[in-house]
């Protein structure tokens, strides 16, 4: 079920993310706060993850700023590594991937992950899916012009 939603628009640049990740951070904080995620919860994050240097560093920074230490224990992947960027369909497809990871306990990998960037130092589930018991799934979607959205899913009761 959808437990939380956040959205912002930082309007920093048409294609580049705001370097301090304020908009993305605030969208994640809104969604996590609305969902009431406890600090000890096991998280999966389906990152926007375009595999571009600016986006990946900025999104990593946003995870750290919004989740604190929880970012370092979260399992994070980019399903774009398997599907490509589907533009308008991306948010819906990645929401489905997030829900399936939560339901089935299988976190999709970030395929083609070869040379980690030192600024991207979280667990990006490289190259192979991982079985994991997760409590919440978070999906981030970022758009041109600084549009930032985040959904939090929990297991249906």
Model-derived features with residue positions:
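Structural signature of cysteine-dependent C-C bond-forming condensing enzymes
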Residues: 1, 26-40, 61-82, 90-144, ...
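A short beta-alpha structural unit
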Residues: 43-52, 79-87
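Glycine-rich beta-alpha junction loops
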Residues: 4-11, 49-51, 80, 142-143
């Amino acid at each position: 079920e959808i437990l939380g939603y956040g959205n912002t628009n930082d309007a920093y640049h048409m294609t580049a993310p705001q370097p301090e990740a304020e908009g993305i951070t605030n969208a994640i904080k809104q969604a996590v706060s609305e969902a009431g995620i406890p600090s000890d919860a096991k998280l999966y994050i389906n990152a926007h993850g375009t595999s571009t240097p600016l986006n990946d560093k900025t999104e990593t920074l946003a995870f750290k700023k919004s989740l604190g230490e929880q970012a370092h224990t979260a399992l994070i992947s980019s399903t774009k590594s398997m599907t490509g960027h589907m533009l308008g369909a991306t948010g819906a497809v990645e929401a489905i991937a997030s829900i399936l990871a939560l339901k089935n306990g299988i976190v999709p990998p970030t395929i083609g992950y070869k040379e980690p960037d030192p600024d991207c130092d979280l667990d990006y589930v490289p190259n192979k899916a991982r079985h994991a018991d997760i409590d919440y799934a978070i999906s981030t979607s970022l758009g041109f012009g600084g549009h930032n959205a985040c959904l939090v899913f929990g297991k249906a009761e």
